[in-house]
Swiss-Prot record:
PANTHER family: PTHR40688, RIBBON-HELIX-HELIX PROTEIN COPG DOMAIN-CONTAINING PROTEIN. GO terms for biological process: regulation of DNA-templated transcription. It comes from the Bacteria. Keywords: Plasmid. Pfam families: RHH_1. This is Uncharacterized protein y4kO. CDD domains: RHH_CopAso-like. It comes from Sinorhizobium fredii (strain NBRC 101917 / NGR234). The keyword Iron does not apply. The keyword Transport does not apply.
């Protein structure tokens, strides 16, 4: 089942969407639906991760000072080598 609704976007965004649709041989509607589906999936994932993190925090599950220091050292070392 599908639902239809109207979305307002800037003219520039509509133009870019039309260009992409043409290059990919798809309709504007298809491209918009794909973009919305991807956005919804990403937002659902992000919210689930935030909720899981908050649940862990409520249980007092935090990274130790040593765990944090290891991660910092890893990325500081990587940045210096670049």
């Amino acid at each position: 089942m599908t639902a239809a609704f109207t979305v307002r976007v800037k003219d520039e965004t509509a133009s870019k969407l039309d260009q992409l649709a043409e290059k990919l041989d798809r309709s504007r509607s298809y491209m918009a639906a794909e973009a919305i589906e991807a956005f919804v999936e990403q937002q659902e994932w992000q919210l689930a991760e935030i909720e899981a993190g908050l649940t862990e925090a409520d249980r007092g599950e935090f990274a130790s000072d040593e765990d944090v220091a290891k991660v910092v050292r890893k990325y500081v070392k990587s940045a210096r080598q670049s």
